[in-house]
Amino acid sequence: MKERKGIEMIKDVPLTGIFVNDQGAALDFYTNKLGLKKIQDEPYGESGARWITVSPAEMKIRIVLKKAEKEHEKAMVGRSDGPPVLTLGTDDVRSAYKALRERGVRFLGEPYRYPWGIGALLLDQDGSPIFLQQESNER
């Protein structure tokens, strides 16, 4: 492998996003069901959309809940034929699975053991897949 020299151009992932149909419903799901913290909620553009970001507590990364307005954006909402749109980490998938189900979160099966840890696939308010993972220390 070639050694890297100089300054790294990419140093962080501060922001990611997910397209949603209804920003209010998405904000409710991500804060009240998943327990993420609302960082921003401000008017954005002339369409009535809002700039909404949420984040796990004490994390630098923010998740934009972007209103799907264009046709290609709308086509991405609720798609479950590809990889999850987000992966969220937890220290205990089984406990999180139980607590989130009690809050009404839909899962596509029970937690499953992988070579790297345990994971479970859940669906957000629009049916977009989100992977909940717990990494193992046994690598």
Where are the language model's segments positioned?
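Eukaryotic phosphotyrosine signaling hubs
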Residues: 13-15, 81-85
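Vicinal oxygen chelate
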Residues: 2-9, 17-18, 39-42, 50, ...
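Short, basic, helix/turn surface patches
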Residues: 64-72, 134-139
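Core segments of cupin and vicinal oxygen chelate
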Residues: 17-61
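Short, charged/polar, Gly/Pro-enriched secondary-structure boundary elements
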Residues: 58-63, 126-130
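Acidic di-acidic motifs
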Residues: 22, 92, 124
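Short amphipathic alpha-helices within nucleic acid-binding modules
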Residues: 29, 94-99
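Short, charged/polar surface micro-motifs in flexible loops or helix N-caps
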Residues: 57-62, 69-72, 92-94
